[in-house]
């Protein structure tokens, strides 16, 4: 359309230019008279004005209008030749002056853009002739000499002078538009899917899509910016917390540097106090009752310096009656048992290290953040080595260090979360940009995401298997701990029941056995590691320290206060027993809760599998969520490595500090406290009664604990069975997912079949309409051909046969329509069934979501159990080191005992004989019972007094029981600590799960948005494809109708020719017959016109382009179109549709 408009404008402009050109060329002789007047009137102001006008008009991209006018020069017969009009010399001079001085008095729309002198001259001539027309009036004689034709043309030129600038301006505007359209269309083709400016609706749709994309991008950017601001706030808060922790660490360091000085002064004071206690027999501590001394042992305010000194005194006093060979076998047995436990723990640690090797590879980024913590731990370890003598201060420092480590771990976790969230949001922004840039490559990206989803599924399966393995290892460790507890209880049961105390007959000095010292040393070492856990622990930990015995001459002073203090001690012990029972009950409830959670593990796995399938089927754009899941898994592995490294470092530091402190304190205190041990033996004999009662109560508590553990074992077995059943259910879930995929494929096939059936039905309906139209056309043709059929019966039979065929086709079409409708009615219940299956799958998805949540909780519980077992391994290693240090101290004490025995043999022959008998009896009993250290004391006491030997035996047995009870109490407290840690970690994992749920909700919202956009695009594509298919079907139907109409036309033409030949042959008939035939033939033309009118009216009134296109072949039949004519009509119909 635009090209036609342009060509029309160009045509009119060319005609006008040709007229003006002829007029200017005819008026070229009159220029002589006008030059003089123009020469005088061309002022400089006017020249400047003409130049400005020329510069304004020269902005158009056209060539010079002079060139334009020269292009449209037309050779006219009325034009005078240039040779016949010679210029006079004045005119020639004026022409030269005009060319040299510039152009004056030019029209507004004339531009001197041409650089050639000849072109400018010709343009000046033409324009001067046009502008100086009024100046020719005074030259009347020259005008009279002109011919009337020239005058007429001049008058016409004067009329055209007003219209010429407007035409030139309109031409320039049109030319600008025509030249601007080409680069605009080129830019459209390069940057948009459009090809020309003839389709504004497509351009509007494209711009709307671009605006939608920009809006989506802006929304995502707003979300990301808000998330970024929140993360920045969290990061700043975490930095502030880290700074506060650093300041606290600096304060701790400064305090640790001040403490060694105070420790030296305190050790000197303690040594002086020990000497004074040895010299002054009337010390107030020595006058205390035996029960009060026992309660002092068990008190949490017990000082380590006193306990070590008293242990050394008991060792030296006991060494007077023991031999070195008697103690070695029992120590070897203890060392062998400890070594076996160490090997078991090492094997467990190796298994754990194998599981965490992969996690350590990913923890390289955390090394820098942990270096500060390790340096601080090393410094605190150095400080602990300096402060061996002050165990109480070291315990406080260990508490501070552990609290600081926990704070550091929390800060590091927060920092990791912030960094991971920041990375996730940056990844979101990048992925959004990539998705906007690569919208055309959506299909390839979707395939890649499917592969990623399958990889994520495999990773999740591996994580589940790892969790199961960890749970099994934890169960094995728990069973090992249970076996240990049962062994300890068996040992306690195998010990003989404590007998009643017999009064001491002889005033012989009695001493405590080395086992007591070892027990106290073990308790002191254990307190260093678990001081934070054992503040509420009573009675057994420091059994020897606070009680300072009276002199050897006063073994028993006041029996009545003993009874009162004994009852008070029993009450406190009962309170401790009640506390232990409550803790055991809490553990039982916790085990029940964990078992209930474990029972729903099968449902959780089903939910996880269904979620993964939903991610594969629907969430093809879940790349962000998968990256976040991977980051969380990496974070878990990093946290595991951090926990293991910190535990190892803490255990190594505490164990080294404890070992060194014990060795040094024992070596220094043995020499100074030997004399004090002799005096304390008498008070220890009185304390035996209270210790026996305490041992009985603790034995009962141990039996109750053993029953509780036996009850917990069947629950563990049930958990193992549930894990086995979970594997079977996992396989069943896989089969179900396959069946689901098959069902979805069937659903898609059924939908395709329904669409095909609908298309077939629509095609059949169009065929029926076309057949009906054909029936109407054929009925009209039948009316027209009735007269011809009267002449020829064959034509009538043929038409009837065609009518029967057409009716048969219509019946067939109706039958096919009915069959298609029946197929649709059959397919609808199938579609309903598939929709019900989809609802069921959605419900299963919700159930699987709940199962996944519960699975995360179980995973957090398993992590807590793992960490608690690691703590147990660290404590067992510490206990092993303590046992080694005890063995060394016992060896030294045995050497001291031998030396003392040799000195005592020199005192008298009677004592030598008694000691020889004691040694012989001791050798005999060592061969019989190597594991008992009481044999040597029994032989010595049989010589002195049978009552003394019984007392010493009981003291040994009580000390062993005390140590075992201490170990059991440690284990109970470790279990309570593990419970607290489990609760804390459960809270943390709940928080983490909530964060994950929020992230998943965001990801699901984003996927829903992407899904809606994808569905909209798909629906648009389906609609466009349907339109294309409909158009193609219509074209095929039209072609088929054309072919059928041609065939019918050929048949009819043949019949008409046959009828005409018959009419020519029957020319011998009468005029009446001819008149009748003419009258009968004349109405045949009348229906043709009426039918043509009705079809044209239908064609013009029809708004549907499809039906209008179907009427084209009917018109072609009536008007006898060719193929080219039909194509032209089809194009015209389509052009009307575009408009």
Swiss-Prot record:
The keyword Calcium does not apply. Residues 19-37, 496-522, 651-661 have a biased composition (Low complexity). The keyword Aminoacyl-tRNA synthetase does not apply. It is found in: Cytoplasm; Preautophagosomal structure membrane. Disruption phenotype: Significantly decreases the radial growth of colonies under nutrient-rich conditions. Residues 7-18, 225-247, 261-273, 373-385, 475-494, 728-767, 786-815, 935-945, 977-1011 have a biased composition (Basic and acidic residues). Residues 1-148, 225-327, 356-388, 475-569, 648-674, 720-767, 786-828, 935-961, 977-1012 are annotated as: Disordered. It is a peripheral membrane protein. Residues 142-170, 215-259, 323-495, 566-1067 form a coiled coil. Required for cytoplasm to vacuole transport (Cvt) vesicle formation and efficient autophagy. Plays a role in ATG protein retrieval from the pre-autophagosomal structure (PAS) and is especially required for autophagy-dependent cycling of ATG9. Autophagy is required for proper vegetative growth, asexual/sexual reproduction, and full virulence. Autophagy is particularly involved in the biosynthesis of deoxynivalenol (DON), an important virulence determinant. This is Autophagy-related protein 23. It comes from Gibberella zeae (strain ATCC MYA-4620 / CBS 123657 / FGSC 9075 / NRRL 31084 / PH-1).
